UniProtKB/Swiss-Prot annotation:
Its main location: mitochondrion. It comes from the Eukaryota. GO terms for cellular component: mitochondrial matrix; mitochondrion. Present with 2060 molecules/cell in log phase SD medium. GO terms for biological process: mitochondrial translation; mitochondrial translational initiation; mRNA processing. It comes from Saccharomyces cerevisiae (strain ATCC 204508 / S288c). Pfam families: Mtf2 (PF19189). The keyword Kinase does not apply. This is Mitochondrial translation factor 2.
Length: 440
């Protein structure tokens, strides 16, 4: 017989063992729940941080785009105050059209009607006389006709030069290897350019001319202070440091409250010619490109490329995205492309630059088209000359001339990558030409 004590003992053992196992299971379940909660919390925190980062960068680029659009939209209105002579009366506002006459025989000296005309008189010099519109005055229509002639000259392909050789080259290449990368771009004959494009070009010319006038004291200071490329490098570094430490609120307030921003720049430049006047978002991009293009600084091309590379890398590596958006505009990229080609003559470097311009929304202008058009023509003419020389040698060789379908792929460092890079640059050039000719 089984004793009662033994039964109770066994029951108590099983009961205690069962309780221990339940406690372990409950503890494991709590650990898993806690781990899942922590993992979900970490994922939510990471997603929130990622979303905030995207929002910050999106706001920065949107703000830069708005500033750029506002600058282009209001540039014409701001500059017209100096070239059209806005006159305020107590009864109302009346606009009095004035024209700038160059090299006029009768230079009538008269009192200018308002402060804006006095500003132009002081900054223009002795070669400008302000009179009412006459047949000899340079009007908007004359500027438009000159701009149209310049555009047609740049866009017109010279088809008479090596036309037969170029057609023979394309025919042989397509028969032999089917290389589509060497196809010639379609000639732009009888191109009609939109009035909006020519108006933008005219506004930019007037904008650059006005900045030349108001920043003349500071440019004269640079001519005296800069004796070597090291001096210019030190000046560029100091200017970038000042921009990084600028008071953003003060500049925004200055832009909002100032009625004549060019006059403010002129006054600050006259009072302190050694300092670059504010707002730096307007003056710094101009002075960087201007200093690298001044004829007084006759530096070698490699030194100029070193200077512009320093500015370019500083803008790209800085945490402040506005530095890149402000400095690296289309004029800066045009100079960068020009110096890249003068120093290296490698199409792959140009391909990287034009790709970056497309990705970052830097739209090329007529100067970009002019620079790239010359580079593409130089690449093609150079390759054609080498190909024709090789073709003459092949025709003299009896063994090779018997094979009609054979072709030799020759050129200056001409390979598959070169063809692809040149094709990308050509496509970018075509898109720029279409953008300048289409109605917006």
């Amino acid at each position: 017989m089984i004793r009662t004590s033994s039964i109770l003992k066994n029951c108590n053992y099983r009961y205690i063992h069962c309780i221990h196992r339940c406690l372990l299971n409950e503890a494991n379940l709590k650990d898993r729940k806690t781990h899942n909660v922590e993992r979900v919390s970490n994922e939510k925190t990471f997603e929130q941080a990622l979303e905030e980062e995207r929002k910050v960068f999106g706001e920065l680029f949107e703000a830069g785009a708005r500033v750029e659009n506002m600058r282009h939209t209001n540039a014409s209105k701001i500059i017209d105050k100096y070239y059209n002579g806005l006159q305020d009366n107590s009864e109302g506002t009346s606009v009095k059209k004035e024209k700038i006459v160059f090299n006029h025989s009768q230079r009538a000296q008269r009192k200018l009607p308002n402060k804006d005309h006095e500003f132009l008189k002081e900054t223009a010099g002795n070669d400008y006389v302000y009179e009412r519109a006459e047949p000899s005055a340079i009007s908007t229509k004359t500027i438009s006709e000159q701009t149209r002639t310049l555009l047609e000259k740049i866009f017109d392909e010279d088809n008479s030069i090596n036309k037969s050789n170029r057609e023979l080259l394309n025919l042989n290449l397509r028969k032999g290897s089917g290389m589509e990368a060497l196809r010639q771009p379609v000639a732009h004959s009888n191109v009609k350019f939109s009035e909006e494009v020519m108006q933008e070009i005219g506004n930019k010319i007037r904008y650059q001319t006005t900045l030349d006038q108001v920043l003349e004291p500071h440019i004269d200071y640079l001519r005296e202070a800069v004796k070597s490329d090291y001096d210019l490098l030190r000046y560029l570094k100091q200017s970038l440091d000042i921009y990084k430490k600028r008071n953003k609120d003060l500049e925004l307030k200055m832009n909002a409250e100032s009625s004549n921003i060019f006059e403010d720049i002129r006054s600050a430049c006259i009072n302190k010619p050694a300092e670059l006047p504010k707002p730096l978002a307007m003056t710094l991009p101009y002075i960087i490109v201007k200093s690298l293009r001044l004829g007084d600084f006759d530096f070698p091309a490699d030194r100029k490329y070193t200077l512009i590379s320093y500015v370019y890398n500083e803008c790209k590596n800085n945490m402040d995205a506005s530095l890149y958006l402000t400095i690296c505009n289309v004029d800066f990229y045009n100079l960068l492309v020009q110096l890249l080609w003068e120093n290296f003559q490698e199409i792959r470097y140009l391909r990287r630059v034009v790709t970056e311009m497309s990705v970052n929304g830097v739209i090329g202008n007529i100067e970009t088209v002019d620079i790239l058009d010359k580079i593409v023509k130089e690449m093609r003419s150079l390759n054609e000359d080498v190909f024709l020389e090789a073709g003459e040698q092949l025709s003299a060789d009896e063994e090779v001339s018997s094979s009609a379908n054979k072709i030799v792929n020759v050129g200056v460092l001409w390979n598959k990558d070169t063809n692809n890079d040149l094709l990308i640059v050509e496509n970018y050039l075509k898109s720029l030409k279409k953008n300048l000719t289409r109605d917006r």
